[in-house]
Amino acid sequence: MEQQRIEVVGKLGSTYGIRGWLRLYSSTEQAESIFDYQPWFLKIKGQWQPIELESWKFHNHELIVKLKGINEREVAQTLANVEIGVNLSIFPLLDEGDFYWHDLIGCQVVNLQGYAMGVVSEMMETGANDVLVVRASTKDAFGKKERLIPFLYEQVVKRVDLSSKTIEVDWDAGF
C-alpha cells in the first residue's frame, strides 16, 4: 500500500491487561468514529501493514482495542505507539468549500497582496471555527515564526487550490 494513500486516524497506546488489549488514541472528531473507517493499517518499521480489529470497548473513559491475532501482552507491547491509518479512498467526497485537514496540511499560504505567509503545519479546532497553523519561513519579513489564521471560507480563506497546494487568504502578514 502506498504511504501517500494512507491517512493517520489514530495511534495505539500502552497495553491493557494480559490478553493483548491496547489503549487507543483516536484523532477523529468523535473518538469512536475511528471504528467506522476500516480496514486499518499499522505503520510498522516505516511500512503500512493491514490489521483486523477484533473488538473494542470503553474502559474508564478510554478506548481499548483487541486486534486479531494479538493475544498476549508481550506481543501487544510491540505495537505500543504505532500509528493507525486508513486508505484515503474510504473518506466520502465533500461539498464545495469543505476540506479534509490532511488536504490542507502542507499547503503554501499566500495573502491577497502576494506575500508568502508560510506553510500549513497543522490544524486546530477552536469550537467556533478551525484554525490554520501556518509555519512562517525563517526569512519572514515580519519576524513571525507561526501564524494562526481562522479557516473561514470566503471571509478569510478566499481560495484553496489543492492541485497547486496553495491557499489564498485575506489576512495581514503582520498578524
Swiss-Prot record:
Q: Which domain of life is it from?
A: Bacteria
Q: Please name the GO terms of the biological process aspect recorded for this protein, alphabetically.
A: ribosomal small subunit biogenesis; rRNA processing
Q: Which Pfam families match?
A: PRC_RimM, RimM
| SUPFAM superfamilies registered for this protein in UniProt | PRC-barrel domain (SSF50346), Translation proteins (SSF50447)
Where primarily located? Answer: cytoplasm
The alphabetical list of record keywords is: Chaperone, Cytoplasm, Ribosome biogenesis, rRNA processing
Which InterPro entries does the protein's record reference? PRC_barrel-like_sf, PRC_RimM, RimM, RimM_N, RimM_N_sf, Transl_B-barrel_sf
Domain PRC barrel residue range list:
96-175
Q: Name one GO cellular component term.
A: ribosome
Tell where it localizes: Cytoplasm
Complex formation: Binds ribosomal protein uS19.
Relate the protein's function as given in its record: An accessory protein needed during the final step in the assembly of 30S ribosomal subunit, possibly for assembly of the head region. Essential for efficient processing of 16S rRNA. May be needed both before and after RbfA during the maturation of 16S rRNA. It has affinity for free ribosomal 30S subunits but not for 70S ribosomes.
> What's noted about domains in the record?
The PRC barrel domain binds ribosomal protein uS19.
Similarity comment: family membership: Belongs to the RimM family.
Name of the protein in its database record: Ribosome maturation factor RimM
Organism of provenance: Histophilus somni (strain 2336) (Haemophilus somnus)
The record lists the lineage as: Bacteria, Pseudomonadati, Pseudomonadota, Gammaproteobacteria, Pasteurellales
Report which gene this protein is encoded by.
rimM
